[in-house]
From Swiss-Prot:
It comes from the Bacteria. The gene is msbA. Its main location: membrane. This is ATP-dependent lipid A-core flippase. Keywords: ATP-binding, Cell inner membrane, Cell membrane, Lipid transport, Membrane, Nucleotide-binding, Translocase, Transmembrane, Transmembrane helix, Transport.
Length: 582
């Protein structure tokens, strides 16, 4: 469970959030002017109440005319001020949230892969969606109330001082009590808000798991188990919201009680101290203003919940923004394309440094060579492929491309030299064309896209789709079969035409006929480029120039398919087992 914000971090969070307001200061000034008009109209209403009392006691034509017209004037001023203030502040708040949410999303795209391993995607999504919404609430409703009701309190308080400053100073004695209540409840609000954020992240995480694994849930009869897990996290979310609302109501009632006691005491003193100087108008003006000040004070107390939730949400977003991005200290650029010579020199790596996944790897892959990595599950095959584009850096040793350490390449330059097709195919909710010509390939012409699709044996089903290349695939390519999705991903890699190609279980989701066609296409595309193949089906890598066998993160055998069979080692055992299964 996440910890509440330390008190010493609250003000820095406020300041950092307010820094997003700076570019929009002009609209903020307009908002303040508008709410100043609104506050002035409120004080004018208190004065009008007193004037109305004097008019009833001593009516004259002039007074009757004034009390008839004044309400209309006050309402016009109040409405104008409300519109100016609310429109301007809403505009500013939406700009702040727009910029903040974009900053967070762009930052997330640049996080190292290790962050995605440490944090479930649902928790990151919760920060961007839910936490940003808390900032929106603080940036719109909360700030509007703070400025509008704050200026109203100042206006009414100034009016009370003008009416009778001595009695008003007595009324001020309740302010420290109100401040004490606000301070205590603010700490509680932040603590509960942090728990609500944690509960919301759990809800998002469990929803994602249940939806993505819906097939497994049904096959294994896990509906009741998943429902029970979701009920628990959902109950926690509801429980924390009830606590937050209870604290909010309690603080509001206590503040109103203090104010009511103060007003009652002042009313008693006002009547007894004014004596003969007491007038109906003066009394009504003072008591009306004192009564009116309760409403903005109540709203300022209520808004404290939104402010604290907004600060908590902002702190969560800033925590994500402060997460270190991928380090890109490389300066080496590539004129056209690398040759594709790869060297691993004493490479060790572990997602947990205490438990290395690969240990002291030493091998070289020549340009244009096709090398297959095989081994039991967890042997480190996919880890090796993930280190080539620097998704992860070695804990020890170094990896070289054309004799140059990977860290010396600019990240974008390095990744431009690599195409990858993994077991987990990622397709976007976009057209077939934009899924093949993705990212830096988006300027590709249709002829190149169609050629890549044909080479991947994908064109035969693409041209049968209702809109061809313009057909929308839906989220994660839901409209396509597993084999079709994989062929789209292969077409994307073919279109990139990179000198280094990584195939991580690239044919795992294909049926035998599709796999046969894909193997023919891959044999052609592998020519002239360095290819690293990871496959569970050993029959798919028999034609590799070299096969490297990994066991517990170490390279134990290497050679051609026939050479390894003759050694009668681990590869032979795996091949026989694999062959019998197929």
């Amino acid at each position: 469970m996440s910890q509440p914000i330390p008190p010493e971090d609250v003000w820095p969070t406020y300041k950092r959030l307010l820094s997003y307001v700076r570019p929009y200061w002009f609209m903020l000034v307009i908002s303040v002017i508008g709410y100043a008009l609104y506050a002035g109209a409120q004080a004018g209403a208190a004065q009008l109440a007193g004037y109305l009392g004097d008019t009833i006691v001593n009516p004259t034509d002039a007074r009757v005319l004034i009390v008839s017209i004044a309400p209309l004037v006050l309402v016009l001023f109040q409405g104008l001020g409300q519109f100016m203030g609310s429109y301007s502040m809403n505009w500013v708040a939406q700009q702040i949230v727009y910029v903040l949410r974009n900053d967070v999303f762009e930052h997330v795209l640049k996080l190292p892969q290790s962050e995605y391993h440490r944090n479930a995607s649902g928790r990151i999504m919760s920060k961007i969606i839910f936490d940003a919404q808390q900032v929106t609430s603080a940036g719109t409703d909360a700030i509007i109330v703070i400025i509008r009701e704050g200026l109203t309190v100042i206006g009414l308080f100034s009016f009370l001082l003008w009416q009778n400053w001595k009695l008003t100073l007595i009324l001020v004695t309740v302010v420290p009590l109100i401040a004490l209540v606000m301070n205590i409840t603010s700490k509680r609000f932040r603590k509960i808000s942090r728990r609500i954020q944690s509960s919301m992240a759990n809800i998002t995480h469990f929803l994602g798991e249940a939806i993505e694994g819906s097939g497994e849930v049904k096959i294994f009869g896990g509906q009741a188990q998943e429902a029970d897990r979701f009920h628990n996290v959902s109950r926690s979310f509801a429980k924390q919201n009830v606590k937050l609302n209870a604290s909010k109501i309690a603080s509001t009632v206590i503040v109103q009680l203090f104010v009511a006691v103060g007003i009652g005491f002042i009313t008693y003193l006002y009547i007894h101290l004014m004596g003969e100087d007491l007038t109906v108008g003066g009394f009504l003006s003072y008591i009306t203003a004192a009564g009116m000040i309760q409403k903005p004070l109540k709203q300022l107390t209520d808004v404290n919940v939104k402010v604290q939730r907004g600060v908590t949400g902002a702190a969560s977003l800033f925590e994500l923004l402060d997460t270190e991005q991928e380090t890109d200290t490389g300066t080496y650029t590539v004129a056209t394309k690398v040759d594709g010579n790869i060297d691993f020199e004493g490479v060790s790596f572990g997602y947990d440094p205490a438990s290395p996944v690969v240990r002291q790897l030493n091998f070289a892959i020549k340009a244009g060579e096709t090398v297959a990595l095989v081994g039991r599950s967890g042997a480190g095959k996919s880890t090796i492929s993930a280190m080539l584009p620097r998704f992860f850096d070695p804990d020890q040793g170094r990896i070289l491309l054309d004799g140059i350490p990977l860290q010396e390449y600019q990240l974008s330059e390095l990744r431009n030299q690599i195409a990858m097709v993994s077991q987990r195919v990622v397709l976007f909710n976009d057209s077939v064309r934009n899924n093949i010509a993705y990212g830096e390939l988006r300027s590709s012409d249709d002829a190149s896209i169609i050629k890549a699709a044909k080479d991947a044996h994908a064109w035969s089903f693409i041209e049968q789709l209702e809109h061809g290349l313009d057909t929308l695939l839906g989220q994660d390519g839901v409209q396509l079969s597993g084999g079709q999705r994989q062929r789209i991903a292969i077409a994307r890699a073919l279109l990139k035409d990179a000198p280094v190609l990584i195939l991580d279980e690239a044919t795992s989701a294909l049926d035998s006929e599709s796999e046969h066609h894909i193997q023919q296409a891959l044999e052609q595309v592998m020519q002239g480029r360095t290819t690293l193949v990871i496959a569970h089906r050993l029959s798919t890598i028999e034609k590799a120039d070299r096969i490297m066998v990994l066991d517990q993160g170490q390279l134990i055998e290497q050679g051609s398919h026939q050479q390894l069979l003759e050694k009668n080692g681990l590869y032979t055992q795996m091949y026989r087992m694999n062959f019998s299964e197929e």
